[in-house]
Amino acid sequence: MAIIRSVIAATALLGAAVNAQVVGTPFGFGAGTTGGGDATPAAPADTAELTEWLADDEPRVILIDKEFNFLGDECTDCECCIPDSNTCGDAGQNAIEVGIGWCGDYPTTTCTYDNAGLDGLDVGPNKSIVGVGDAGVIRGKGLRIHGTENVIVQNIHITELNPQYIWGGDAISLDGADKVWIDHVKISLVGRQMFVTGYESSGSVTFSNNELDGTTDWSASCDGHHYWTILALGENDKVTFANNYIHTTSGRAPKVGAPSFWHVYNNYWSDNTGHAFDVEESGTNVFIEGNVFEDINSAYNDDGTGAIFAVDSGSEATCSSVLGRTCVANSLTNSEYTAVADESVLSAFPADEEGDITILPVDQVAAYVLANAGVGKLSASGSTSGSSSSIAPSSSVPVIPTSTPLVYPTFTPPAVETNAIQKEHEVSTPAVPTPTPVPSSVGSHGSTAGSSHPPAFSRTSFES
């Protein structure tokens, strides 16, 4: 009987492993990413084994079948500063002094934070990191995909990276990476960027079906909305950003600031008290179509010098001569919008590299994204690709095509700006909404006890 039970248990584990393989295939600029390929799926026993498996050079399919909690190594009575943006005390964000001069002349204070968040988990080549059901959580650390290639991250929740502190940690950081697919990931409660691309170019990245949840008790804009959402400052990056849900934010959603190309379609932006797009630098091209903007204070920051083609009802036909199809207009409800249709973006669009995509009619986008973006929803959507670049008819059921492209840019940090936060928070914001409950354990803005010290800090994500 014991033997039979063992066989049944082993069979169940094998079935779970098979079912936890990557679902669907990457589309867009990230097409062709295979991750760990046919490696046998395996679940690490603990955080130490997860850390080891992620960083090695072996092709792996790593199952995240539970919560991996990296919290517990606190830095107490450590140096922080109070930036000008924090006008609301404990409801705002102070900043960790990380040794790059960012704090400048801001008033100093002491604070308690968790050391784990400051440096992400290194990810080596040929990895698939796949959550099982809705159980896959990485708490306290992000993923650092630097100088590597062929990585898939799917169906996990990354959360609680010192959300009360600027410089508390980045959820997903790319730098000099290629062939990366980030899919069905939820990110919440981070101190700094939810997604950032770093100094060296990360060529082909797909970012699809993800939920970026900015609900927070500690807001740099003092309104319960997370400011640091996406920062992309790398040159020559090609990004297809599709089917994502970005909500309860107040800025940098995204900020794109170096010559690169983003194709942004079928995303749902909701409840942004500041600005969504900040296209900062000349040579940057952002093509925005078929998205829903709902309750967005400003869809675009007017200060940037990059090129934007945002499709509205007056520019839908413009794509025909360049792309051979009609563009899909964006939808805006209770959102500030200035028409921007720089046709140089279409001329620069590397459609042959993006490959085949399917774009939903805009009236289907919000419902589709809410049903499919984030963790535990793989069976609902599948991440698949279509056979041709096309517009799905409005009567069709909103199913993601079998291979739709999504890619992320790489970032090159600008010079440190002491007053960067203050400068980017000039938009007035409403009263603070009811925030998300405090997670398992967080530090305080001020502290007078303890003797721990922060780890050596390596700034690899961004500096402004």
Swiss-Prot record:
EC annotation from Swiss-Prot or TrEMBL: 4.2.2.10
Principal location class: secreted
Keyword hit for Transferase: no
Keywords: Carbohydrate metabolism, Cell wall biogenesis/degradation, Disulfide bond, Glycoprotein, Lyase, Polysaccharide degradation, Secreted, Signal
Intrachain disulfide bonds: C80-C103, C319-C327
Residues making up the signal peptide according to the UniProt record: 1-20
InterPro entries: Pec_lyase (IPR002022), Pectin_lyas_fold (IPR012334), Pectin_lyase_fold/virulence (IPR011050), PEL (IPR045032)
Family per record: Belongs to the polysaccharide lyase 1 family.
Name used for this protein in its record: Probable pectin lyase F
Origin organism lineage: Eukaryota, Fungi, Dikarya, Ascomycota, Pezizomycotina
Name of the encoding gene: pelF
